[in-house]
A protein has these predicted regions:
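N-terminal targeting leaders
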Residues: 2-3, 9-10, 17-195
Length: 195
């Protein structure tokens, strides 16, 4: 019951514009409880910064595309929109050799940038899913990164197959989610990661 009350309060805060509070709490929780060690977290942060720098340095990509990047355990997710398949591929090629990147998931769609309203909806969906995961006693939600882009939810992290299934089910329950993409590294015995 207590977890449901906390989850409801977090949702209410998010709807009132307190996203910075929730994001700060979520980021703080990730640092303390997630499955990556501090070294890997640092590598992932550097991957994200370097990838964003490279995208911004490519003038054509920067001016015509909307691309977001997220790194977890060396896996780099590219999502967003590019006007042509050529630019989609170029973004991947530009970022494939960023130091620390093990694998690139290119989920960029072809088309124009999404609206601010859609971006806001995506942020709300991410907050809602993270809150529901936090309220689930069977899930270590701090080991899962949730990214929502144009109604598609991407789940990244190091989890067991059971936890991955629970997380995907929670994400699918949202009525506005069009698709759920799981990009997990699975732990077979609690420590070993199977890609």
């Amino acid at each position: 019951m207590f977890k449901k009350i906390i989850a409801s309060l977090l949702c209410a805060l998010a709807l009132q514009g307190c996203m910075a509070f929730i994001a700060g709490a979520a980021i703080g929780g990730v640092v303390v409880f997630e499955g990556r060690n501090w070294r890997q977290q640092n590598i992932d942060n550097r991957i994200t910064v370097e990838a964003e720098k490279k995208l911004n340095a490519d003038e054509e990509l920067h001016n015509s595309s909307r691309i977001i990047v997220s790194s977890y355990n060396g896996d780099l997710l590219l999502a967003g929109q590019a006007p042509t398949p050529l630019l989609k591929q170029r973004a991947e090629e530009d970022l494939r050799y960023v130091p620390g990147v093990k694998r690139v998931y290119n989920e960029i769609s072809i088309g124009g940038p999404i609206s601010t309203l859609t971006e806001s909806s995506d942020a709300w969906v991410t907050t809602k899913i993270k809150t529901e995961m936090l309220a689930n006693a069977n899930l270590r939600s701090s080991s899962i990164k949730v990214i929502t882009e144009n109604g598609t939810v991407f789940l990244m992290g190091m989890v067991t197959k059971t936890q991955g299934s629970i997380a995907a089910d929670i994400a699918r329950e949202s009525s506005v989610v069009q698709r759920v993409v799981t990009l997990f590294s699975y732990k077979s015995d609690g420590t070993k990661v199977v890609h």
